[in-house]
Amino acid sequence: GRGFSAPAGVDEAGRGPLAGPVVAAAVILPPGYFHPGIRDSKKLSHRQRERLYPVITADAVAFGIALATPGEVDALNILRASLLAMRRAVEALLLPADFLFIDGNRRIPCDVPQETVVGGDGRCVSIAAASILAKVSRDRMMVEYDRIYPGYGLSGHKGYPTREHLEAIRRLGPSPIHRRTFRGVVV
């Protein structure tokens, strides 16, 4: 982290789903931190991510997890809602970050100096750690939502547009956590 004492990696999960929030995480790791298992959450199994979650939260100097609601996704658009969730995750850090490494190519709207890293979840350990916290947190929320809104199979597909999910929306109509502005969500 080039001389910064508290750089945070920031990433989000849940841009593509038709239902549920966008969840973001910001993680500050100790200087020189390395863990062979921590890499892009999309390359890890559900079980590997669940196993790494408590390792990351224990080892991190600080972490923040936050979300943008399905209503905010509809009101703002998915990109702006993702950036909002990431800003909230940075604001949730108990130790303020002095620099941000953001996965992707869009800066987040806040005053902390930052650098965007395309493919960052595969190139920067703090972004990879953030991707795991965001994905695990979101997956756990979707399992809870499946209990509240049964019939859509949310705990299986996590809100992504599977055939089963699209058929359930056609059959049941959208739930309160469905993103009304997304194609496939028939109101």
Language-model features: locations:
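RNase H-like, Mg2+-dependent phosphodiesterase core
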Residues: 1-187
